[in-house]
């Protein structure tokens, strides 16, 4: 991910480093995978202001992201890598061979035109999805399910990942940064 260093015009920008956004494609988002969201503007369900200084901002459309990756053994091609206003990570638009389109969280190093797949036994490449039990010890993983079939819940934000540190019977021991030292997953 290319980084942009800001000019030290003020004290706040002296050591500021941000994303250069050069990896993002200029395609418009897929309309079938968009939903409108209503801004709460700091109001609760009764309409009363419960959070001060909230409101305004740019209108956002929610992108429906596939956290389950349950389309097994069907290859897909990365059509574009896009910005998502609701999360820190970029998202990738996948075009499956059967014609379906889905968004996933884009791991670092994913390129447009790359072929990826979700399967039980799969090559270890960036973007492929597999059960934790089939991956080798020491592999970096992201978008981890805590409960089978519930979808990814761990290591979903930009730059976050977990490391497979061992196995204990049918469980896999995963080390997540800044969390419990080890989390057991199937």
Predicted features, each with a name:
Residues 1-87, 108-186:
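Basic, glycine/proline-rich low-complexity segments that contact nucleic acids
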Residues 95-102, 120-126:
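Short, structured beta-strand/loop micro-motifs enriched in basic residues and often containing a Trp
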Residues 99-111:
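Beta-strand/loop nucleic-acid-binding surfaces
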Residues 84-92, 101-104:
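Short, flexible active-site-proximal loops enriched in glycine and acidic residues
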Residues 92-96, 172-175:
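SH3/SH3-like beta-barrel fold
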């Amino acid at each position: 991910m290319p980084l942009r260093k800001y000019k030290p015009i003020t004290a706040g920008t002296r050591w500021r480093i941000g994303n250069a956004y050069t990896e993002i494609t200029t395609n418009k988002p897929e309309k079938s995978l968009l939903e409108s969201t209503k801004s709460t503007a700091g109001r609760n369900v009764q309409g009363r202001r419960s959070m001060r200084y909230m409101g305004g901002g740019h209108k956002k459309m929610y992108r429906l992201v596939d956290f389950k990756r349950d389309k097994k053994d069907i290859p897909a091609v990365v059509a574009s890598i896009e910005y998502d206003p609701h999360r820190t990570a970029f998202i990738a638009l996948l075009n499956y061979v059967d014609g379906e389109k889905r968004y996933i969280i884009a791991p670092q190093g994913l390129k447009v035109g790359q072929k990826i797949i979700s399967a039980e036994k799969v090559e270890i490449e960036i973007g492929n999805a597999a059960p934790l039990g089939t991956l080798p010890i020491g592999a970096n993983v992201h978008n981890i399910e805590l409960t089978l079939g519930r979808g990814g819940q761990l290591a979903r934000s930009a730059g976050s990942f977990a490391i497979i540190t061992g196995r204990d019977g049918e469980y896999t021991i995963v080390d997540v940064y800044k969390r419990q030292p080890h989390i057991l997953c199937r």
